UniProtKB/Swiss-Prot annotation:
Positions of glycan attachment: N193
Compartment(s) of residence: Membrane
Membrane topology label: Multi-pass membrane protein
Alphabetically ordered keywords of this record: Glycoprotein, Membrane, Transmembrane, Transmembrane helix
Keyword Membrane carried by entry: yes
Major localisation: membrane
GO annotation, cellular component aspect: membrane
InterPro entries per UniProt: AA_transpt_TM
Intervals, Extracellular compartment: 32-36, 168-204, 255-276, 328-354, 419-421, 492-496
Organism name: Homo sapiens (Human)
Residues spanning the membrane: 11-31, 37-57, 147-167, 205-225, 234-254, 277-297, 307-327, 355-375, 398-418, 422-442, 471-491
Protein name according to UniProt: Transmembrane protein 104
Topology Cytoplasmic: residue spans: 1-10, 58-146, 226-233, 298-306, 376-397, 443-470
Length: 496
C-alpha cells in the first residue's frame, strides 16, 4: 500500500536489486511499444525513447533522495522519542537535572546536525521502507496528499483496465484464429473486425466479452481478500517473460537475416507521437515501487551508478525489441500485443511456440491483476481514512473492492484498444507519477532537510541533478506533455 512504512524485508545485493528493477520496468508496456514505434517513425521513436528514459532516470534519483530524507526524519524522531522516555523515567528533578533539561531545550532549537555525536550512524541511510504515500504525508500538505492519492488511483485504474483488456484480447485473437478458416493464426494480410465470426454465430467481440466475463469471475474475487505474489511465482513469471522476449527477438532477427523482413518504417510521422509518448512513459514507470526495491539493497554505496546502468540496459533492450519488430513486420500488420504477430505459420512453424507466445501474456498478466487490484483498494482506504477511525464491515469488505473492480472492467468491456489505453494511462496519470510527484517530493524534502538539519548537512543519496533548475525543468516538461497530448487528442477527434 502506498501509505505505509513497512518492514525492510530480506536483504539482497545491489546486482540482485538491479535485476528486480529491470523486471519491474520491463513489463506489459514493452509489448505495445513496437506498434507505437512503427506508427511514429523510427527516428522520432528513438529520440523520444532516449529522452524519456533520461527523464525517468532523473526523477528516479529524485525519489531516492526523498527516501533518504524521509529516513533521516524518522531517525531523528526515534532519537527524540528515546530522550522523552528517558526523561519520563528520571526521578524528581534536581538542580543538575534542571540544568541538563535547559541544555537539551537549547539543543532542540539548534539544527539537528549540531546535536549529533561523532560515530553515530548516518541519518540519511535508507534503512526503513517508506512508501511514496508516507513520503507525501511527510512533505506535502493535505491538498498535496489528496492529489498524490488521486494520481496513484487513476494510474492503477488504467493499469487494471489494460490488464483486463489484454488477457481477453489475447485469448480472442488466438482461439478465434485457430478455430476459424485460418488454423495458423493471424495472417499478414488478414484484417479482422470485431463483427467477424469467431465460432458459429458468435462474433469476435462476443468472444472477447465472454473471455472478459470469465476473467472477471475468476480473478475479481481476489480483490475482496488480501493476496501477495510469492517469490516462486515471481521467478516463474519472470522466466516465462524473458523466454518469450528472447524468442521474439531471435525469430525477428532470423527473418530479417533471411531477407524476409517486411517492414519499411517511416523516418518520422508526428501523428503517432501521442501514443508513443504515453507508451514510453508507461514503459519506464517504476517510481511508485522504488521504496520496495531500493530499501532491501544491502550496499547502497554506488546506487546512482547502478540505477543508471539499469536504464542503459533497458534502453538497449527496448531499442532491440522495437527495431527488430518494425523491420521484420509491416507497420499495418503489427498487433497491439506484439506477441500476437508470432501466431503466424510463416513466422513460427512450431504450434507449441505459437501458442506459448500468443498466450504468455494471459498467465503473466493474470498473476499481476489481483496484486494491483488489492493495492488500489488499499489506496482507496488510505485516502478516506481518518485517524483512529475504522470502516464498517460493508464499506471495508464490499464497497471498496467493488469500486476497485467495476470501473476497469467497464472500460475493458467498451474497448480493447491496448495502444490507446496504454498511451492515455501513461500520458496523464503516468506523467503525474513519473514527473510531477517526484519533482515536488524532492523540492519539499530539500527545504525541510535544510530547515531541520542546517545548511551544512549533506544527503549522501542526493540526486546528481541537485540544482533547482532540474526540478523546474521536469515540471515544465510534464506540463508541456500534458498540453501536447490533450491538444493532439482534441485535434484527432475533430478530424473524425
Amino acid at each position: 500500500m502506498a501509505g505505509e512504512i513497512t518492514e525492510t524485508g530480506e536483504l539482497y545485493s545491489s546486482y540482485v536489486g538491479l535485476v528486480y528493477m529491470f523486471n519491474l520496468i520491463v513489463g506489459t508496456g514493452a509489448l505495445t511499444m513496437p506498434k507505437a514505434f512503427a506508427t511514429a517513425g523510427w527516428l522520432v521513436s528513438l529520440v523520444l525513447l532516449v529522452f524519456l528514459g533520461f527523464m525517468s532516470f532523473v526523477t528516479t534519483t529524485f525519489v531516492i533522495e526523498a527516501m533518504a530524507a524521509a529516513n533521516a526524519q524518522l531517525h531523528w524522531k526515534r532519537m527524540e522519542n528515546l530522550k522523552e522516555e528517558e526523561d519520563d523515567d528520571s526521578s524528581t528533578a534536581s538542580d543538575s537535572d534542571v540544568l541538563i533539561r535547559d541544555n537539551y531545550e537549547r539543543a532542540e532549537k539548534r539544527p539537528i546536525l549540531s546535536v549529533q555525536r561523532r560515530g553515530s550512524p548516518n541519518p540519511f541511510e535508507i534503512t526503513d521502507r517508506v512508501e511514496m504515500g508516507q513520503m507525501a504525508s511527510m512533505f506535502f500538505n493535505k491538498v498535496g496528499v489528496n492529489l498524490f492519492y488521486f494520481c496513484i488511483i487513476v494510474y492503477l485504474y488504467g493499469d487494471l483496465a489494460i490488464y483486463a483488456a489484454a488477457v481477453p484480447f489475447s485469448l480472442m485473437q488466438v482461439t478465434c484464429s485457430a478455430t476459424g478458416n485460418d488454423s495458423c493464426g493471424v495472417e499478414a494480410d488478414t484484417k479482422y473486425n470485431d463483427t467477424d465470426r469467431c465460432w458459429g454465430p458468435l462474433r469476435r467481440v462476443d468472444a472477447y466479452r465472454i473471455y472478459l466475463a470469465i476473467f472477471t469471475l475468476l480473478l475479481g474475487p481476489f480483490t475482496f481478500f488480501d493476496v501477495q505474489k510469492t517469490k516462486y511465482l515471481q521467478i516463474l513469471t519472470s522466466l516465462m517473460r524473458w523466454i518469450a522476449f528472447a524468442v521474439m527477438i531471435v525469430l525477428a532477427l532470423i527473418r530479417i537475416g533471411h531477407g524476409q523482413g517486411e517492414g519499411h518504417p517511416p523516418l518520422a510521422d508526428f501523428s503517432g507521437v501521442r501514443n508513443l509518448f504515453g507508451v514510453c512513459v508507461y514503459s519506464f514507470m517504476c517510481q511508485h515501487s522504488l521504496p520496495s526495491l531500493i530499501t532491501p539493497v544491502s550496499s547502497k554505496r554506488h546506487l546512482t551508478r547502478l540505477v543508471f546502468l539499469d536504464y542503459v540496459l533497458i534502453l538497449a533492450f527496448y531499442g532491440l525489441l522495437s527495431f527488430t519488430a518494425i523491420f521484420c513486420f509491416r507497420g499495418d500488420s503489427l498487433m497491439d500485443m506484439y506477441t500476437l504477430n508470432f501466431a503466424r505459420c510463416d513466422v513460427v512453424g512450431l504450434a507449441a511456440v505459437r501458442f506459448f507466445l500468443g498466450l504468455f501474456p494471459v498467465f503473466t498478466i493474470s498473476t499481476n491483476f489481483p496484486i494491483i487490484a488489492v493495492t488500489l483498494r488499499n489506496n482507496w482506504k488510505t485516502l478516506f481514512h481518518r485517524e483512529g477511525g475504522t470502516y464498517p464491515w460493508v464499506v471495508d469488505r464490499v464497497v471498496f473492492p467493488t469500486i476497485t473492480l467495476v470501473p476497469p472492467v467497464l472500460v475493458a468491456f467498451c474497448t480493447h484498444d491496448l495502444e490507446s489505453l496504454v498511451g492515455i494511462t501513461g500520458a496523464y496519470a503516468g506523467t503525474g507519477i513519473q514527473y510531477v510527484i517526484p519533482a515536488f517530493l524532492v523540492y519539499h524534502c530539500r527545504r525541510d532537510t535544510q530547515l531541520a538539519f542546517g545548511c551544512g548537512v549533506s544527503n549522501k543519496h542526493r540526486s546528481p541533478f541537485r540544482h533547482t533548475f532540474w526540478v523546474g525543468f521536469v515540471l515544465l516538461w510534464a506540463f508541456s506533455c500534458f498540453i501536447f497530448v490533450t491538444a493532439n487528442i482534441i485535434l484527432s477527434e475533430t478530424k473524425l
